[in-house]
């Protein structure tokens, strides 16, 4: 599960990053990151891979700090916790250096690549990017075996769980000289934040949780259920939208029909890669097609094309599907090995066959993800987790929770669940959001609320009415 970034407020940096950093931040060095104009501060903190024995292999945790612009009235820092699991937190530096500068008015922003991600011993191997790769199964057997063999040369794959990583994060906090911190987690990053809140409660000032993934979620058990709910809502919007309904008057039937066709026989499509003369034949299986559609509901920008894609595919035309599925310019930003090390310890082993059958039978997305990840975890070493890992996290810290009503992986009910144990929390549902704010108008609404929450240290008096004005883009009804 991955969360996408929100468009953030602009604020002139005024060259403040060139100031001398106080306290523990002086341990960092000025640095330049690709695509970012201003000077940031970077460093490495070395931790033991095995935190219990404190011997053997070490990991250099990659740290990027974007300093607050107002050092005189500077408040507690914001620690960014990335999603995935497997996404680099340092990759978010571009947001906070550009459209997200408003977050840094009074707060340092600290991005730490969690062990196994980014430049902190990233657990991933290269893959050949043929056109078929983009529509192949998630975890082919040979790929998982090859990845495990390669990564075990430089990592104990059982030592990359969330609980271990959050102790790393607290080491970084102490090393940089911070006392209490604000946590900002999206998707899997919300689980990381919750675990940090349980393990290091005295150092949490506040938390912002966007698209909540509770510790007991058992990913990907509920992906099909959540995806089907989001799809019903999305297709319902199309049916009520005059242009979309006029273009695709039987869109719900189209959705059922294309899945039935692919269940009977995978589609074989001639595809001409850009810049190459010879076409290639691509096979599209039902499970892969469904998973692509579900993943495109994460952001409303891509979701706007789903009715078009479904309608044409139901009529045997997969051109628009492949146009969106095959995107060589998009990097592999999730470290697959880290994803497996987390979920094969914290989630998949606790999925029973009875649960999986009950939740996926008759579901349009079926058991694809459960099957793929269960099979992969059968070939992956399993890490240990604390006995109370799946229990609810209780905290008196102020917490602001955002959920998207059309989220296909972490629907609002998960935000409601965690809020029960957070008495100083507030749960805000964004009516038209998916698994993040991508594609919505007035995305600055969420940023304004988040910054105001951090400044006040309370969510009680926030005027959240602006979330009702965050509108999705119009449905795409024709090829572009």
Each language-model region and where it sits:
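Long, low-complexity segments enriched in small/aliphatic residues
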Residues: 310-311, 315-352
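Extracytoplasmic ligand-binding site segments that recognize negatively charged/polar headgroups
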Residues: 117, 291, 334
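Second-shell loop/turn segments in exported
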Residues: 155, 279-280, 292-296, 330-331
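P-loop NTPase catalytic cores that bind/hydrolyze ATP
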Residues: 282-311
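Gly/Pro-rich cap/lid or specificity-loop segments adjacent to the active site
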Residues: 17-288, 341, 345-480
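Bacterial N-terminal signal peptides
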Residues: 2-12
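Short, solvent-exposed helix-helix connector turns and helix-capping sites enriched
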Residues: 241, 302, 313-320, 443
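Hydrophobic residues in alpha-helical segments
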Residues: 238, 262, 297, 310-314, ...
